[in-house]
Amino acid sequence: MMKLIQNIDVYAPQHLGKKDVLIINDKIVKIKDAGSICADGFLSEAEMINGEGLLLTPGFIDCHVHVLGGGGEGGFANRTPEATMEGLTKFGVTTVVGCLGTDGIGRDMCALVAKTKGLNEQGMSAYCYTGSYQIPVHTLTDSIVKDIMMIQEIIGTGEIAISDHRSSQPTFEEFARVVADTRLGGVLSGKAGIVNVHLGDSPRCLDLIERVVDETEIPASQILPTHINRNEMLFGKSIEYALKGGAVDFTGNEDIDYWETICDEVRVCNGIKRMLDAGVNPDRMTISSDGQGSLPMYSSDGEFLGMGVGQSSCLLKEVKECVFKTEIHLEIAISTITSNPADILRLKGKGKVEEGYDADLCILDQELQLVEVIAKGNTVYTK
């Protein structure tokens, strides 16, 4: 199986200019200046893709998705549906990291690992965290270390909740032990050993995370706090944390105006711009969707309007806002959903348009609308 993409403007995510890109099976095998790879000889059998006027980026990585479905906090009727490969790839997502949230009982680690394996077999790339909001962590085996070390799909622990009324109200010692065990599992397996941390509305914000970094030998690189744009106070603390080298994850939204005006969230594009202006390393920022999570919707008067469901479609929507609204360079904006999560989570072969990397690619037009999505060398979406 071969594909030859010709004369396409490549953002790898750094801007490479117009290139020819050769894909054989599931790998990118050659990237040359436009017009340098000729479709003759054995390449005459390759599928030809005309990239004139189009952009090529890495496939998107959604690093926080409730692939088994989320919700349930308002009762069983509020459980949300599972993610599907088609529902992810049509939005450009070629790699997903699944997690459990508030409900670690009605949904468990056996089901999460099985779902993750299924997505991999269907043709995309999928990983997952062990655990849920709760501490002690509900693992698949008898320990966090063993889960990460022995289960291929498990790359860390999460989403552990802190500063939230739905958390287990862990002590510093309990939280630090989870981070330490997760790091050890990563060290022994060659994985990231990341703890994905859900941040709630409490004014305690990132206190437990900061104490782990300040009072133990564990580096900030072992923790990825998410929902940092939940409110202004939390976001301000997150800037301080990121300036110390910590990675931070913005939660994207499909209805961006609603969450900014009604719920007082920090708009993702504005938040990224503020972090860049403050001097935060752009490599330390990611955007995820909280996909399939339940989203209660209220009017400006506080009237309940209904329950929405998080969608991975918000990733590209937020990138467009960064580029067209706050004039952030595309290289920086697109890295938040490609190379940054790949590097932070140590996802080998992911997140870059580079020779030897996996053929996970998105083709977009000049308005950043998806035209085609390629996962593991196969076309999984066309406009």
Describe the role of every protein-language-model region.
Residues M2, V10-T57:
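Histidine-rich, glycine-flanked metal-binding segment
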Residues I8, V21, D26, G53, ...:
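Divalent metal-coordination and catalytic microenvironments
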Residues I8-V10, I28, V353-K383:
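C-terminal cap of metal-dependent C-N hydrolases
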Residues L43-A46, G51-A114:
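Metal-associated gating/positioning segment near the N- to mid-region
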Residues G71, G75-N78, E82-G98, D147-S168, ...:
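Active-site gating loops and adjacent loop-to-helix segments of metal-dependent hydrolytic enzymes
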Residues A83-P136, I151-H165, V187-S202, S221-T226:
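Divalent metal-dependent hydrolysis catalytic cores, especially in the metallo-beta-lactamase
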Residues D277-Y357, L361-L364:
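His/Asp/Glu-enriched, well-ordered alpha-helical/loop segment
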